[in-house]
Structure formats: structure tokens, C-alpha cells
């Protein structure tokens, strides 16, 4: 998956390289998150439910934040660039996670995998939008950088944990969880559109 993207990055020119850089960063932190999740699950002797609802949201959201913090500290980007970088990182994280899930579990239940992919992708994009949009605001105010970043990370972790909790619970809650991020994204898009007009 990475080699075609690398070739595309070389062919697209300098303006598009940031996109590919954050795409690779998202995939890389997804891979590292899997190892770190496994380590903490073994360290705390967590069962699948605890690992999914307590460990994974914290590890994954912190890992998605690290490339953004590096970008903010080294390059001091504009607000719109911060938002784009956060969403691209989250989107590539979700894409790689869904590919790993598909490889691990097979395509026997295509409809389940399809809805899981959409729900998980939307959830990661919402978490990325929370962090990216918030960082674009709080990093313009020196006094708010640390507390604001921690608060945004906490909000993203909470949303992610609620999503994972509903998924792990199963039954009707699982299907609500798959629909919830999609509905939130649609509502957010409508609100954003109406505020512009």
C-alpha cells in the first residue's frame, strides 16, 4: 500500500507532498498503535473488552496527535494547514486500520465490514476534526496551548472510547455506533454550511 503512494508522492510535485507525508504518518502511527495497544493489554492483563474501551482510545488518539505536535512545533503552520493535517492523519489511520481488520478477519461478511469501515472512518475523521480544529484555535494563544491541547485530546479520547464501548457491547448498540459518527459528520457539515451563508 505504501509503495504506490510513495511513487504518487514523487510524481505529484512539492505542493502535494505534505498530503502524502501526513498520509504516511497516519499509517505509521496506526501500525505503532497496534504494537503499543498489545503491549499495554499484556502489561495490565486486560481482556478484549477492557483493551478496546480503555487502552485503545488513549493510545490511538495520543499517537495521532504526535505527528501534529511535531508539525506545530517545527513548522508553525497556518490554521487551515493544521486542520487539513489532522484530518489527513486521522483518515489514513482509519484506512490502514480498516485494511488490517479486513486482512485479519476476511471478507466473509461484506456488509458488516462495509458499515464498520464507514463508521470507523467517520469516527477517526471526527476525532481528527476535533483535534485539528481545536489546535488551529488554541495554538494561536500562548496561554492556552498546553491546557487546550490536553482538553482536545481528552475530548477525542472520550468520543473514541464511547464509540468503542458501543461496538464492544454488541447488538443494537453496535449498529448505533456505526451510524453515530456518520450522522454527526452530516450534521456538522450542515451546520458549517449554514454558518457560512
What does each model-found stretch correspond to?
Residues 1-197:
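Hydrophobic alpha-helical segments at protein termini of multi-pass membrane proteins
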Amino acid at each position: 500500500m505504501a509503495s504506490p503512494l510513495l511513487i504518487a508522492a514523487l510524481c505529484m510535485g512539492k505542493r502535494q507532498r505534505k498530503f502524502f507525508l501526513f498520509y504516511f504518518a497516519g499509517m505509521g502511527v496506526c501500525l505503532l498503535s497496534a504494537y503499543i495497544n498489545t503491549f499495554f493489554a499484556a502489561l495490565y492483563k486486560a481482556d478484549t473488552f477492557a483493551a478496546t474501551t480503555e487502552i485503545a482510545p488513549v493510545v490511538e488518539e495520543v499517537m495521532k496527535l504526535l505527528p501534529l505536535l511535531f508539525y506545530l512545533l517545527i513548522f508553525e503552520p497556518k490554521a487551515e494547514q493544521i486542520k487539513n493535517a489532522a484530518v489527513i492523519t486521522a483518515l489514513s489511520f482509519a484506512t490502514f486500520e480498516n485494511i488490517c481488520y479486513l486482512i485479519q478477519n476476511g471478507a466473509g461478511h461484506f456488509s458488516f465490514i462495509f458499515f464498520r469501515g464507514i463508521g470507523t472512518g467517520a469516527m477517526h475523521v471526527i476525532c481528527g476534526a476535533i483535534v485539528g480544529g481545536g489546535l488551529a484555535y488554541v495554538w494561536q494563544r500562548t496561554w492556552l496551548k498546553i491546557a487546550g491541547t490536553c482538553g482536545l485530546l481528552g475530548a477525542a479520547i472520550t468520543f473514541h472510547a464511547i464509540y468503542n464501548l458501543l461496538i464492544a457491547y454488541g447488538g443494537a448498540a453496535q449498529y448505533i455506533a456505526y451510524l453515530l459518527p456518520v450522522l454527526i459528520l452530516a450534521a456538522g457539515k450542515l451546520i458549517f454550511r449554514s454558518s457560512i451563508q
